[in-house]
Amino acid sequence: MALPRNLLTDNPELYEARFPDPDRLAGRWTEDCLRRYGAGPRVLDMGCGTGRDAAHLAGVGRTVTGADVSEAMLAHARVHHPGPVYVHADLHGFDVGVFDAVVCLDSALLYCHTNAQLDAFLTSCRRALSPGGLLVAEMRNGAYFLGRTDLLDTPTVSSFTWRGTVHRSTTTLTVDRTAQLLRRTRVWTSNDGSAPVEQRSAWRLLFPLELRRLLTSHGFEVLELHDGPGPRTEPPWREGRLPAGTTDADRLHVVARLNSPV
């Protein structure tokens, strides 16, 4: 799968400036999940991006492979977040070794837009996991958009400064009900005289019961499925906070164990 041109994924340092995580919240949340369910040391971070979370997991003693489809992200990760082994791989089908856990954070799983792509991802996870291995994923919650339009009504404007240049983004979200996708149009402008850049992307909208059934059909036992707390929730997760019993808010978190063969 070739990535479309994208200002942030093509410029990993810019990505980290736009989405700072100085406390490694996502990595710590993931390690908490892995530790709580006794995962072994071998971890695959699928869709690892700049490598921050993979490096955190390596730093606490795990043997980590970070995988991504973006060569720019992988090159950045190898230099700036050493520790893991970084490899090129596609969510829609991969075979990069055997692990005790597969991690897929920040809605990366939702770039599987079709049922066939979701099946291919979970088939690859099943192949990659040792018996009893864990899948830990964090993503947008499709159920949030049932009857809610607050994230759709008004474009979201944000800005940040990187190396003296102010970058401003205007993001519009729309729901494609037929394809069950959340489509995003983002227009970037900056004060350095560059022409505006328009980018389009999409996430699959998965609903909690749909995700549970999908995982079960691929041989996983769902251990947790909830809307928080997590690294992207408000308030965010912190050590000692246990999962909620609801799946109503805008993020969805899942921990599933691959059933051992009978």
What kind of region is each of these model predictions?
Residues H92-A101:
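A short acidic, Gly/Pro-enriched loop at the edge of an enzyme's catalytic core
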Residues D100-A116:
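A short SAM/SAH-binding and catalytic strip from SAM-dependent methyltransferases
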Residues D119-P131:
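A short glycine-rich, Lys/Arg-flanked "PGG" loop and its adjoining helix->strand segment in the class I
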Residues G51-G93:
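Class I SAM-dependent methyltransferase SAM/SAH-binding core
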Residues V136-R213:
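SAM-dependent methyltransferase
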Residues L205-V262:
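C-terminal lobe and adjacent flexible extensions of AdoMet/dcAdoMet transferase-like proteins
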Residues M1-G49:
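Conserved class I S-adenosyl-L-methionine
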